[in-house]
A protein has these predicted regions:
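Core beta-strand elements of the Rossmann-like FAD/NAD(P) dinucleotide-binding domain
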Residues: 2-3, 188-196
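Short beta-strand to alpha-helix junction loop
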Residues: 61-65, 95-102, 144-160, 271-276, ...
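Active-site substrate-recognition segment that forms the wall
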Residues: 6, 16-23, 34, 45-46, ...
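C-terminal catalytic lobe of FAD-dependent flavoproteins
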Residues: 290, 294-368
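Helix-loop-beta segment of a Rossmann-like dinucleotide-binding subdomain
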Residues: 83-94, 111, 118-168, 261-266, ...
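Dinucleotide-binding Rossmann-like beta1-alpha1 core, especially the glycine-rich loop
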Residues: 46-133, 283
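A conserved short coil-to-beta-strand element within the FAD-binding core of flavoproteins
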Residues: 150, 171-185
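Beta1/beta-strand and adjacent pyrophosphate-binding region of the FAD-binding site
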Residues: 1-11
């Protein structure tokens, strides 16, 4: 029987779920995108979770599977007619100042490669070699190179997923939605009925659920980044994961994306802060001094969602089985988000999902 499935949230989770639901079924799928502050649309990401030193093994298992899922998703997008993919494996360089920290990181990569071949070749490079590898780089740090690390343009991926969704017969609406009575959604002057609904609205999840009497363990975090157009030959540069919060993502044609900030006290503020942008550019210029004299070509800002224990959650509400939720992905949303969206689509359609999602149950984060 044909069902009505609604997705609220056009970010990475919602757009992926919409793409796969419309690809794998004949149900009527509606995606509602508010279009304001979407973290993944504002983001460009390095996809390389294997060398993260976060200790939580559930988080690592999810993000490692998320990174591996990119290979399948790129195949599916190619099959859908995509000519230029937004994800490329050009490697990732993780910088450390002390030799013992580099060796520790390298060993971590070797250990994890036994169950994650996608890491690829691992190497330790000293500062002298790095300065030769990237001629514009100036550093006294060493780095570990993971050849399997990827880079991603978040906005380009969202556009492709939503284009594929529309080609599959999906309906895309814009606006701020609310849950109504008896399995309905209120969107401006429309009332839409659903059989199943996915709430993939990131930091805005409390706004939707709290009027129904739920308490949601989610807080917003502001993230800003900047772009600089250079004359560097960046096409085959690896992503640079610098000490602190700053990454440098190289794209074709000399474009460098720098960021992102992690601002916990700004709520849903989406104003560009010149001081924060300037500080990030200054930090990046310590490694690429030529950046100091180049103008900023573009800035972006979005709102991430975090839980109190920094783990994401996804699944359906125990007292309302027709309502599915996903939030709390934080700064690893581009890595884990597509895999989460794909899983929820499969479970809703009654297809197999071998991944154990029980550690990410919404029950401990959403109370009534």
């Amino acid at each position: 029987m044909k069902k009505d499935i609604i997705i609220i949230g056009g970010g990475i989770v919602g757009s992926t779920a919409a793409f796969y639901l419309s690809r794998e079924s004949k149900h009527h799928i509606t995606l509602i995108d508010m279009g304001i502050g979407t973290a993944s649309r504002a983001a460009a990401g390095i996809i390389c979770p294997w060398l993260s030193q976060r200790r939580n093994q559930d988080w690592y298992r999810l993000t490692a599977q998320g990174a591996a899922f990119y290979l399948q998703m790129m195949e599916d997008l190619t099959e859908a007619g995509t000519q230029k993919l937004p994800y490329q494996q050009k490697g990732s360089l993780i910088f450390k100042k002390k030799k013992n920290l580099l060796e520790k990181l390298y060993q971590l990569g070797l250990d994890r490669r036994e169950s994650a071949e996608m890491i690829g070749e691992l190497s330790i490079y000293d500062a002298q070699y790095l300065n030769q590898l990237i001629p514009n780089l100036v550093t006294d740090h060493g780095a570990v190179l993971a050849k399997g690390g990827g880079r991603l343009d978040g906005a380009a991926l969202l556009d492709l997923l939503q284009e594929g969704f529309l080609q599959n017969g999906g309906t895309l609406l814009h606006g701020r939605a609310q849950l109504g009575a008896k399995q309905t959604v209120l969107l401006e002057d429309q009332t839409l009925a659903y059989d199943q609904i996915i709430l993939a609205c990131g930091a805005w999840l409390p706004d939707i659920l709290e009027p129904l009497g739920y308490q949601v363990d989610i807080r917003p975090q502001k993230g800003q980044l900047l772009e600089v157009q250079t004359a560097f030959e960046t096409e085959n540069w690896p992503g640079l994961i610098l000490p602190g919060e700053i990454d440098i993502l190289p794209f074709e044609g000399g474009k460098l994306v720098i960021g992102a900030s992690h601002e916990n006290d700004k709520g849903f503020d989406l104003a560009i802060d010149p001081e924060v942008i300037g500080d990030m550019k200054k930090s990046a210029s310590q490694f690429l001094p030529d950046l100091a004299d180049l103008p900023i070509s573009k800035t972006r800002v979005g709102t991430r969602a975090y839980t109190s224990d920094f783990l994401p959650f996804y699944g359906n509400l125990k007292d309302r089985q027709s309502i599915w939720v996903a939030s709390g992905l934080g700064s690893s949303g581009l890595t884990s988000g597509p895999f989460i969206g794909w899983q929820m689509a499969r479970v809703i359609l009654g297809l197999t999902n071998p991944f154990d999602r029980s550690p990410f149950s919404p029950d401990q984060y959403i109370k009534k």
